[in-house]
């Protein structure tokens, strides 16, 4: 995530999934060339290709080796397919604590300020840029 963010991978992508009280998800490169309105229109169609894109590689899961893997309100975590080792570029922010995800999805960040902004994010909203602070290398 940090490497992709520093390369500008996320710049201009749109959030493509919002489940109130659960998560807001982004990071799918298939949203890059779509307008926000097109993303909103396609978001309800499971065959539209949203949520299926990635950076061309996948990341091994880390939730099984991280005792602090807790999905709290504002946690930043890697989205993936059914394969635990399939995470790539897609991420989600928790909209409330989601402990049922702790044993299956890797948390790698925590929102420390701006939860009011996260709560207002919706499908089609544009990721202008991602700024990394205090990242472990």
Annotate each PLM feature:
Residues 2-137:
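Cyclophilin-like peptidyl-prolyl cis-trans isomerases
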């Amino acid at each position: 995530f940090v490497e992709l963010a520093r390369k500008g991978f996320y710049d201009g992508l749109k959030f493509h999934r919002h489940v109130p009280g659960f998560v807001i998800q982004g990071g799918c490169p298939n949203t890059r060339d779509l307008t926000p309105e097109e993303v909103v229109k396609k978001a309800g169609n499971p065959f539209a290709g949203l949520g299926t894109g990635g950076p061309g590689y996948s990341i091994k899961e880390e939730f099984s080796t991280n005792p602090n893997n807790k999905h709290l309100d504002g946690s930043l975590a890697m989205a993936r397919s059914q394969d635990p080792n399939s995470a790539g570029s897609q991420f989600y922010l928790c909209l409330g604590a989601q402990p049922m995800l702790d044993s299956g999805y890797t948390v790698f960040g925590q929102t420390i300020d701006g939860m009011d902004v996260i709560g207002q994010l919706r499908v089609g909203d544009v990721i202008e840029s991602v700024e990394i602070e205090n990242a472990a290398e």
